[in-house]
């Protein structure tokens, strides 16, 4: 699958907020958005008034960039969200949050979702004891994510385990055993991603 290979800092500047696409660098003075918090391009410093459609489109682009999902896959997620009982926008965010690469990132295995995605692709993780190297794999309640025995001995994963993150209520982790369990589906209040999902629903409802 094709991936965006350009300067990711431009994406943050385009959206007008930090998307934390470069991990630890985003928290330092080296962050391009900290130094130039306006849109890229010649007219970047003079932001024009955006139409309702433009706001809806920007919100969709923001969600795609945060979770590292391309257009075709994002549209599939939305169609799945519509078929699930409940509010479509919240269902969409739940599906994105339950991606294996996102859960790996939430657990602290990677300073960014991009790094976590690479770790998944390289086969470092198991789901219910079986290797899963598909970043988009949707985790289900009661499934257990663990680090492979081989990877546990590496300095990278030892460092990750020694610096655990504060986890949302729907994930329980045992860093001593390099394991985590999905104990519930994420509620909207558990999702701290700066996305206005109602705008995305409005866009796809046209």
Curated annotation (Swiss-Prot):
Part of the 30S ribosomal subunit. Contacts protein S5. The interaction surface between S4 and S5 is involved in control of translational fidelity. PROSITE patterns: S4. GO terms for cellular component: small ribosomal subunit. Residues 98-164 form the S4 RNA-binding domain. NCBIfam families: PRK05327.1, rpsD_bact. Belongs to the universal ribosomal protein uS4 family. InterPro entries: Ribosomal_uS4 (IPR022801), Ribosomal_uS4_bac-type (IPR005709), Ribosomal_uS4_N (IPR001912), S4_RNA-bd (IPR002942), S4_RNA-bd_sf (IPR036986). Gene3D superfamilies: Ribosomal Protein S4 Delta 41, Chain A, domain 1, RNA-binding S4 domain. This is Small ribosomal subunit protein uS4A. Transmembrane segments: none annotated. One of its GO terms (molecular function) is structural constituent of ribosome. Keywords: Ribonucleoprotein, Ribosomal protein, RNA-binding, rRNA-binding.
């Amino acid at each position: 699958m094709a991936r965006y290979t350009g300067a990711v800092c431009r994406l943050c500047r385009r959206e007008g907020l930090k998307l934390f696409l470069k991990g630890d660098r985003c928290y330092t003075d080296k962050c391009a958005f900290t130094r130039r918090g306006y849109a890229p391009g010649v007219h970047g410093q003079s932001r024009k008034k955006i139409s309702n459609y433009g706001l809806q489109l920007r919100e969709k682009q923001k969600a795609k960039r945060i979770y590292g999902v391309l257009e075709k896959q994002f549209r599939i997620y939305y169609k799945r969200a519509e078929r699930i009982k409940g509010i479509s926008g919240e269902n969409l965010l739940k599906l994105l949050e339950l991606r294996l690469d996102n859960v790996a990132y939430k657990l602290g295995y990677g300073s960014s979702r991009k790094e976590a995605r690479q770790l998944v692709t390289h086969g470092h993780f198991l789901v219910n004891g079986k290797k899963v190297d598909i970043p988009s794999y949707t985790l289900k309640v009661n499934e257990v994510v663990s680090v492979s025995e081989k990877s546990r001995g590496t300095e990278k994963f030892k460092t990750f385990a020694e610096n655990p993150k504060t986890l949302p209520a729907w994930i329980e982790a045992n860093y001593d055993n390099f394991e985590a369990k999905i104990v519930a589906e994420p509620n909207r209040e558990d999702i701290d991603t700066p996305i206005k999902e109602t705008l995305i629903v409005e866009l796809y409802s046209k």
